[in-house]
UniProtKB/Swiss-Prot annotation:
Protein name: Phosphoenolpyruvate guanylyltransferase
Role of this protein: Guanylyltransferase that catalyzes the activation of phosphoenolpyruvate (PEP) as enolpyruvoyl-2-diphospho-5'-guanosine, via the condensation of PEP with GTP. It is involved in the biosynthesis of coenzyme F420, a hydride carrier cofactor.
Xref: Gene3D superfamilies: Spore Coat Polysaccharide Biosynthesis Protein SpsA, Chain A
Any one Gene Ontology molecular-function term assigned to this protein's record: GTP binding
Keyword tags: GTP-binding, Nucleotide-binding, Nucleotidyltransferase, Transferase
Binding site for phosphoenolpyruvate: T168, G184, S187
Protein's UniProt keywords contain Cell membrane: no
UniProt EC number: 2.7.7.105
Family note: Belongs to the CofC family.
Name of the gene: fbiD
Pathway: Cofactor biosynthesis; coenzyme F420 biosynthesis
Gene Ontology biological process terms from the UniProt entry: F420-0 metabolic process
Species this chain originates from: Frankia casuarinae (strain DSM 45818 / CECT 9043 / HFP020203 / CcI3)
Amino acid sequence: MVAFVWLPRNGVSWTVVLPLKNLTRAKTRLDRPDRSRLALAMALDTVMAVLESETDLVGAVMIVTNDRTADHALSTLLNSHYIGADQPNLSPAARSARLVVIPDEPDRGLNPALVHGAALASARWPTRAVAALSADLPALRPPELHQALSEASQHRRAVLADATGTGTVLLTASAGATLQPAFGPHSHATHRRSGAVDLTGTLGGSVPGLRRDVDTLADLAQARDLGVGRATRAALTAGYHSPLVAEDSGGSGGESGTSAESGLSVPPGIVGGTQRRIVSDASGPGRAKKYP
């Protein structure tokens, strides 16, 4: 049997930054009472798909969030066997170091969160390019991300439209370049006007999972047709009868996998661990610190 190994084009390594808003305010257009659970599950599937990329392509995944329930779920994901499961030669420390959660210190919406995350990523890993990725891509496949990042590596800044052609699912900046995120209505055109090279025509329909973000029930149906990840499948199987996220989406939870204050269970197969953050303090930006 012949095994094909993809190597990053031009030797470019990436830090992928994903913003995740408070779960109680997430996916308000998704007309389901369990939308908070689904928002978290889709984010976890997105993160796991990115982490399945080769380490020389994606050096780290940085999630920017202030949501405690998401924080807990991501921290338990940190030490799960899913991180780097297809790369058994990686040490546990090397696997967990790829997943970084930082607080959304601006706390002023999606774009300030991305600016904050990109700045910390560039300070910690100045030789890496930065990619801002939507956190609602439950059908994302690692080869799709590899293909998109390989194309993006040829440009100082690049953008990929969502399935509708008007929004943005991926915005990239080479090492030393400014990301300039402007996510929101008609963001694809806005990013193009700011100088980002459009990858949509080049990639076309070859990356359907990457372009299928989920905001509505119709979007969710299309993602399910493409094939969603294990966390989203579990959330959909649990259905409307699962506990919903409480108003404050608080609580760090315990090893049971449930956030005590929120009542939102971590999707099955994810075990307890520790959380790693990058914090800005007197020692300068980008210092790694562990939290119990």
